[in-house]
């Protein structure tokens, strides 16, 4: 196995190997694609390191600061506690976002009016006291790692009060959000707040827990965007980019969703709670996204010639074992012409001719079973031969008993060996020495003695 396959996720590796099994020469193409992507990634890392190095010498004067958040947890593009500033670049007087540590600039986004494409506040699913600030932007003409900041509501409220941006009695974090949004507008970009009451009244934003491959994350459904986060890579989709959606792997508890973009890319998100289906389906319908769950390409494919389906394989196995004939036996259905006749036989009241035919059939079946047993003796080991012989002896004894009963009553139904006339029973018992004389005396019912019972007294 080529080394690059080991670095792919399990699901992606299986897909690649499936294609390679059909087209062995394609492995070299996959290798080239992997190398190209790796070289591009290494180049991006080198560029980022160079840019971070060049910003180490920069500093932001206090008079150029428009707004700042001190000691907040930055998760991307860096991962550390930093002070985030919206300031004016001294070189060209354009607004910028600066990430500082001890008054040194570690990362900067220049000309935020053009570079910031989308920014929003998002709820932190596990903790109500935290909120995300997410920002998607371009750098040097390409999408860079998005900005993701975790804001502690109590900490931010405290900072705002210390700067006299809020009154001492204010405790609503929404006041901080509104202030930050106004400052962003002043510098040329907007921060949306889709989960605020005013927006929720007109558009229902929501989020669901899910998996992207082996990575657990959250899928946010916003008015004009869908975001998956927040483990890298963070994915952002514009609603208008989504061409279709499919639902799959539907179980009693969970289901999968696959987003298909207009350029044909597919992004599958799995293990979504069934309770969220109605919200997702309503969102899809409002955005007029096509549901391709029942499209021809997703339907079960017809087996190719030479291939045996699971159903036909099962059928073949049943035929070999003889089980299929038993399963397909005739039922005593009312529409069946033989319904009444078979029903009569079941209680032993059939005609004599039918009984004889059934008896012959019984004998034939016994003979067939004995023949099958004889054939099986050649294939079975010694233990199985002994068991077969015992079964044959039992069958012979049963057959002898049936013959005795049949001789006693030729018209008896084989399906019920004891369905004979009442007056024939004594003859049969006497023939086998089973009748003994029991002396009895009949009591005179005309005597005056009080008696109980049947009126028969035994000596």
From Swiss-Prot:
Function, as annotated: Histones H3 and H4 chaperone involved in the nucleosome formation and heterochromatin silencing. Required for the deposition of H3K56ac-carrying H3-H4 complex onto newly-replicated DNA. Plays a role in the transcriptional regulation of the cell-cycle dependent histone genes by creating a repressive structure at the core histone gene promoter.
Subunit organization: Interacts with histones H3 and H4.
Pfam families cross-referenced by the UniProt entry: PH_18 (PF18469), Rtt106_N (PF18215), Rttp106-like_middle (PF08512)
Domain of life of the native organism: Eukaryota
Subcellular compartments: Nucleus; Chromosome
Bias kind Polar residues: ranges: 401-418
Gene coding for it: RTT106
Source organism of the structure: Kluyveromyces lactis (strain ATCC 8585 / CBS 2359 / DSM 70799 / NBRC 1267 / NRRL Y-1140 / WM37)
GO molecular function: DNA binding; histone binding; nucleosome binding
Keyword Translocase in annotation: no
InterPro entries assigned: PH-like_dom_sf (IPR011993), RTT106/SPT16-like_middle_dom (IPR013719), RTT106/SSRP1_HistChap/FACT (IPR050454), Rtt106_N (IPR040993), Rtt106_N_sf (IPR044891), Rtt106_PH (IPR040770)
Residue numbers spanned by region Disordered: 289-459
Keyword Nuclease belongs to the record: no
A GO-annotated cellular component: nucleus
Family per similarity comment: Belongs to the RTT106 family.
Record keywords, A-Z: Chaperone, Chromosome, DNA-binding, Nucleus, Transcription, Transcription regulation
Composition bias, Basic and acidic residues: 289-300
UniProt feature, compositional bias: Acidic residues: 330-345, 352-398, 421-430, 442-459
Protein name (record): Histone chaperone RTT106
